[in-house]
């Protein structure tokens, strides 16, 4: 895996986490069924972040500690 790809994937994980957090906050502002739809979207974003994280881990990429902590707290 190239350094450029590692950098892009790490940046994308940060974006997926931010998206997850945004959709979760939005879901708390609505009643059903909108709440559930927004929560489901947040779950998808979390899944994307975890998949990218897993790919990097399989390639033995060392990740910043803050990113490790964010992933583990999701």
Where do the protein language model's features map onto the residues?
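Non-heme di-metal
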Residues: 1-74
């Amino acid at each position: 895996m190239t350094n450029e790809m590692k950098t892009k994937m790490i940046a994308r994980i940060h974006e997926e986490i931010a998206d997850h957090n945004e959709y979760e906050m939005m879901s708390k502002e609505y009643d059903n069924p909108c709440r559930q739809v927004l929560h489901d979207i947040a779950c998808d974003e979390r899944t994307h972040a975890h998949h990218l994280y897993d790919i990097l881990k399989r390639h033995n990429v060392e990740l910043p500690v803050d990113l490790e902590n964010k992933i583990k707290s999701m």
